[in-house]
């Protein structure tokens, strides 16, 4: 395997609407991100994954794109975008754009033309049928919407304002590749590809993910755009297995650099149930099994994985699986240490590095997320008690990740001088960047050290992975690289756990506890975590 820059990279996801507001309108923007690049450089990250900033009516927070080659006015201008790319480059930070090509907004010129003129070439850029089948939207209800002008139904797997593309249309594909090259020419560092596993869909056969033409389309995209350039490309692939991940990310296949797989994240939900039926407790045995599978079955020569706990669609890990009260700092560090020393490219979601938590939502009028509001409406119609609905939204709703970044203890956590578009978490006076930077033992410095370890240690790329047999709530593994052996241990519980180290400790790479004491006593305190190199 040829080593690439992204094998040692750590990517930081910015959700622009909630990161930093430069002009007091309550909405984060591009100049706001640029103003915080020194902070991100201090953390040490290699790249920023930028959630969509394209022109959009914002029905789904920018994932409904009206113009791929224009910036949404709420975020700034194309000049602001160029400046962000240039200023990031000065700090050795690359900008990864969020590529949403499964669908557009219904306000995109292509869709407008498709509706106005059924004989236009653009009509075939979307999927139209005389009669709907029973496919359902991910955002609830039918995936088909009736268009009165033409008397046909169009397909939308997300909101009805997000019509799905017809990837079978070659002209559409060429238009998409031209748009990608527009951004590549601007000097971006790659693409994160939203729900990319859906582009090969065959709606008449109810094939939604992993359709037969998915990989041929990605090979074609690779050749037409980023294939000969040193860019990071990552596909959002909810249904991927290690075998499927190889199809995407094996360098010989010439598709993508890596995938986002969500098998571990699905432990947040009850099996076979909608996401709102969340699991009350983390199944640690299953978590170990899933990570062991991905670490051992997706070999370094066969492909590459992403490592993440959080993103803009998920609840805060420290709240759903950690302990965001007594052990907030320690459990946040434990999850970071456990994940970042595996094979793959780690992703940090904004605020994760300071231990931001879920928001204590009490009423529906505090909620902005379209998915949560659709769920609430349908659940209320079915007679589900409001308190039960609010409990689900508090635990699993997407707005938990989208509350404004907590910069300091001033009004609105320093995010904006105006009224924030979504309320700031009331705990911002205790949990904020200023506080984290002032405390040498904060979560921030654990993340900073993990980023540094990855930059400096190539064994993280190639070392074998061996899961250790331990107490149920202890997750421990060995990374073996030639004669060197590194032991990573995390107690994922509020209780003490027995654990004995086989062999002698040569050195401590990182810890959230006094490792020597834990090793000598053969007992892990709640949420203890560390990585040590073992002596020969």
Residue map of PLM features:
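Carbohydrate-interacting/catalytic domains
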Residues: 1-55, 82, 86-88, 345-348, ...
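Acidic/aromatic-lined carbohydrate-recognition and catalytic surfaces
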Residues: 2-177, 181, 185, 196-253, ...
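Generic enzyme active-site microenvironment
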Residues: 96-97, 192-195, 234, 308-309, ...
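Conserved alpha/beta catalytic core and glycan-binding cleft of carbohydrate-active enzymes
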Residues: 106-138, 218, 222-404, 409
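Active-site rim elements
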Residues: 166, 317-330, 430-441
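Active-site regions of oxyanion-processing enzymes, predominantly non-cytosolic
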Residues: 183-193, 305
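Hydrophobic alpha-helical scaffolding
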Residues: 207, 211, 277-284, 325, ...
């Amino acid at each position: 395997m040829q080593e690439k820059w992204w094998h040692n990279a750590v990517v930081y996801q910015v959700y622009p609407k909630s990161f930093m507001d430069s002009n007091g309108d309550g909405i984060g923007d591009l100049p706001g991100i640029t103003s915080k690049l020194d902070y991100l450089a201090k953390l040490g990250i290699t790249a920023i994954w930028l959630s969509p900033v394209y022109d959009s009516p914002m029905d789904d927070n920018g994932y409904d794109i009206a113009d791929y080659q224009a910036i949404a006015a709420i975020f700034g201008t194309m000049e602001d975008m160029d400046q962000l790319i240039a200023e990031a480059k000065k700090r050795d930070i690359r900008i990864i754009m969020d590529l949403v090509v499964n669908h557009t907004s219904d306000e995109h010129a292509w869709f407008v033309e498709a509706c106005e003129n059924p004989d236009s070439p653009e009509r075939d850029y979307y999927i139209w049928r005389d009669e709907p089948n029973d496919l359902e939207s991910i955002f609830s209800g039918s995936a088909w919407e009736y268009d009165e002008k033409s008397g046909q139904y169009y397909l939308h797997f997300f909101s009805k304002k997000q019509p799905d593309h017809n990837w079978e249309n070659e002209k559409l594909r060429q238009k998409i590749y031209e748009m990608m090259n527009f951004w590549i020419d601007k000097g971006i560092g790659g693409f994160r590809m939203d729900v990319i596993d859906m582009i090969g869909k065959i709606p008449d056969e109810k094939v939604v993910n992993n359709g037969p033409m998915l990989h041929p389309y990605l090979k074609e995209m690779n050749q037409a755009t980023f294939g000969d350039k040193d860019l990071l490309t990552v596909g959002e692939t909810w249904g991927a297995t290690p075998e499927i991940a190889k199809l995407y990310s094996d360098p010989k296949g010439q598709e993508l650099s890596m995938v986002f797989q969500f098998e571990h994240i699905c432990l947040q939900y009850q099996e076979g149930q909608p996401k709102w039926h969340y699991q009350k407790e983390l199944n640690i045995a299953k978590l170990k099994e899933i990570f062991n599978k991905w670490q051992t079955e997706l070999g370094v020569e066969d492909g590459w994985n992403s490592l993440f706990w959080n993103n803009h669609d998920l609840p805060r890990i420290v709240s759903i699986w950690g302990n965001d009260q007594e052990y907030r700092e320690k459990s946040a560090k434990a999850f970071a240490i456990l994940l970042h020393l595996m094979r793959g490219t780690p992703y940090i979601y904004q605020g994760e590095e300071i231990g931001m938590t879920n928001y204590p939502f009490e009423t529906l009028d505090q909620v902005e997320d379209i998915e949560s509001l659709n769920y609430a409406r349908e659940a209320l119609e079915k007679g589900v008690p409001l308190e039960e609905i609010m409990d689900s939204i508090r635990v699993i709703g997407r707005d938990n990740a989208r509350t404004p970044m907590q910069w300091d203890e001033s009004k609105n956590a320093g995010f904006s001088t105006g009224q924030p578009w979504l309320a700031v978490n009331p705990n911002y006076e205790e949990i904020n960047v200023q506080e984290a930077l002032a405390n040498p033992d904060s979560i921030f410095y654990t993340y900073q050290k993990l980023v540094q370890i990855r930059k400096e240690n190539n064994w993280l790329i190639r070392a074998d992975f061996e899961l250790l047999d331990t107490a149920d709530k202890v997750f421990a593994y060995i990374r073996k690289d030639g004669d060197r052996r590194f032991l990573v241990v995390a107690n994922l519980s509020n209780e003490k756990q027995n654990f004995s180290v086989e062999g002698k400790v040569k050195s401590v790479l990182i810890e959230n506890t006094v490792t020597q004491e834990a090793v000598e006593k053969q007992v892990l305190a709640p949420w203890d975590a560390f990585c040590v190199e073992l002596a020969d």
